A protein has these predicted regions:
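Nucleic-acid endo/exonuclease domains
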Residues: 1-120
Length: 120
């Protein structure tokens, strides 16, 4: 599945890349509202995906512009968000847009194993 072959349903409140991540989570056996939630409000902003199964995981989609134009300040903000969530026992995995659209099932599988491939 690629971004160009993905049809985002009307009413989806998020990016196409986030919808691809959502679909990959479902294909990985995760059930919405039971295992994970999309776009909940968390302290300090919004994290795209939080989980009840496993409860110590969160994922954030980094959109294309963000991925290509991030500098040290943006990475510092990401590291701060990761540290804040880590203080609550939650691992935040960043999902880079380009990697997500190339192979969403692989990237989500890696994220579910707590493997963060951002900034590689």
């Amino acid at each position: 599945m690629t971004l160009s072959s993905t049809k985002v349903p009307e009413g989806w409140q998020g990016s196409e890349a986030a919808y691809m991540a959502f679909g990959a989570l479902v294909r990985a056996g995760k059930e919405p509202r039971r295992d994970f939630s999309y776009a909940p409000r968390m302290e300090g902003g919004t994290v795209d995906f939080t989980f009840t199964n496993p409860p110590d995981l969160a994922m954030q989609v980094q959109e294309s512009f963000y991925s290509h134009h991030s500098g040290i300040e943006t990475r510092g903000t990401d590291m701060l968000a990761k540290a804040q969530l880590a203080g609550r026992g939650i691992t935040l995995i960043m999902l880079e847009h380009d990697k997500l659209i190339q192979d969403p099932d692989w990237l989500i599988g890696e994220a579910l194993r707590y493997r963060d491939h951002s900034w590689e």
